[in-house]
Amino acid sequence: MADAPRVRAYVGLGANVGDPHRTLQAAVSALAALPGARLRGVSRLYATRPVGVTDQPGFMNAVVAVDVPAGPDPDSGALALLLALKGLEAAFGRQARRRWGPRELDLDLLVFGRHRLHVERPTSGRSDDL
């Protein structure tokens, strides 16, 4: 049986609460364990200064390339991944804080194949609201 169609996605990871290095390592493993996911690459870790709210510890960041099921259409495939990312953030204990504030784990869907994501959901314009 042939594999279902897949899409290459790039996910940004960041953390600055607790042990960010260990958190990002565990998050990469959790991303690889998502149903149907195939990890394709992981960048090195980058130490970055906070933006916006600067009175907080610096961040550790990375980017992961992962092939995921495309879904019946690009919108549903991207939304499924976005919701999975938000679920992982919650599982890692992410707390609701001010914009650009500290993060136990921040996962951002940077690229989903060649698709531009259009989400039909009320938001305030921030990815944190999904």
Predicted segments with their positions:
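Short beta-strand-to-loop capping motifs
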Residues: 15, 64-70, 111-114
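Short helix/loop segment flanking the catalytic signature motif in cyclic-nucleotide metabolism enzymes
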Residues: 66-83
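Residue-level signal for pocket-adjacent positions within structured domains
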Residues: 12, 40-41, 46, 54, ...
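Flexible, gly/pro- and Lys/Arg-enriched active-site loops
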Residues: 51-59, 79-130
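N-terminal beta1-alpha1 ligand-phosphate binding loop
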Residues: 2-37, 43-47
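Short, charge-patterned binding micro-sites
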Residues: 41-71
